Amino acid sequence: MNGKANPCSSSSRKQQPSNHDVSSGGKDLQVATLPAYQISDSTWEERAICYFFDQFTIVECNAVGGMGHLGFLPSLYADCRDQNLGNPASLSLRLAVDATALMALSNRVNVPGVVTQARYRFGLALRRLQEALDLPAEAAKDETFATLVILSLFEDISGDRHGLTSAHTVGFEALTRLRGESQLGHAAGLDMFKYAYVRMQIEFLLLKGKPSLDSDRLVERLDSADPLQSLMIIASKVRQLISEPTSASDSLQSAGITKLASWIDSCRRLDSELFQWTQTLSDIWLPLETRTHTGEDVLTYREMIAAVIWAHYRVLRIFIHSVMADLFRALVSLLDSPGIQHEASQHEADGLRISLEMVSDSCRSVPFCFGEIDMLGNPMPPSEQGMSRVRAFYLYTMLWPLWYILSCGLATPEQTQMIRGVMARTGSEAGIKLATMLATYDGRDAMSSMPQLYSLERPVREVSVI
């Protein structure tokens, strides 16, 4: 460790790196080995698949409770390919993986025709997906939901979003409804549900979309002892709470004093629940306070997935305090009460302090999360291949939390410049065009309308096993 740790803050727990961390840290950072896409005796399709699976799928890590990301996908893809299955669900998955892998690799290498092949297979995948969606038995398969997951990655890798809205949110809602509780009973189904749920919450909370799926019953079945799943449970409560104020016919004041007071109390309980979430975490999940070789105070983590989860936690806390501030302002405008005005002023001060701390902690985490330093604060050497030291999936999952830090209006000019810089670098080094788009986002048209890439007709809309 390069310096002494700062005292722990009152809003979350942090630690200093231990001797054990010195010997075992940095497992998520990539070593400078020869990338699979540079092996000369393989086709571009083979190189693309190797690159995509290496960068966007994570094998479960026992140290953090078996968490991975799409770790089942390589074997599922291999089954669909090797068995030469001709059903729409299997064909759509094969084509979606091929298309997304080629698009991901095309952003790393300059080879004529790779992008053309990627978009051609993307079109074929959409066609096969539509065929699967038209057949209830095919629509409910893991392969169909996995296709939707992969196509949503294609959308962000290629930069095909119109505004900030995803074209696949309606599809995620419909298939989540169709698959029901049974999807939580096996590892692949739970993995895909978590991915889809986080995307839907981003759409509804951060981008102020209108959900058509009531997923509360599914979320209630998640494991509250699991850090990510317990945070998802709290996020569901946040969505339930804000759905009422945001649906108010005219303004918050129209809800009346009693309702406003009730919403404020609910916000307080949820903020307390979020804080308590940090107190239940085991040491392996806690941020580590250390100092870089230049004397900068930073936060690092024992596992990269922990950094991602903390990034989403901080956004939820900022979001809750922003909502609470709006509710207090509406209440003060209806009540000429010195007591209420004092309480509102006190909350505004406390909420601003906590929110600024969340922004600061998010920015202090950036050097580690984007591969500039290791867990002990030491600088990482540059990659020989010009790639990020962090897997593309981890960089991808950090984009929306950092975008919210940019858009909430609390970041300093220096913090804003730093976030835009790492996003722009992610766009070029990891080849994720969404990062480039978010880095230059000017705050307009957050929810522009999107054309439907596929239709979700009666078989998917009306059949449900929930």
Predicted regions and their residues:
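Acidic, Ser/Thr/Pro-rich intrinsically disordered transcriptional activation regions
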Residues: 14-114
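Fungal-biased detection of long, low-complexity, Ser/Thr-
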Residues: 1-25, 108, 112, 119, ...
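Generic structural signal of hydrophobic/aromatic residues within well-ordered alpha-helices
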Residues: 48-60, 69-80, 196, 218, ...
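Membrane helical hairpin/interfacial module
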Residues: 82-166
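A broad, low-specificity signal marking well-ordered, structured residues that form hydrophobic/aromatic
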Residues: 95, 145, 193-194, 400
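Inter-repeat boundary and helix-capping residues of tandem alpha-helical solenoids
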Residues: 86, 91, 141, 227, ...
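Central/C-terminal regulatory/activation regions of fungal transcription factors
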Residues: 53-70, 115, 158-336, 345-372
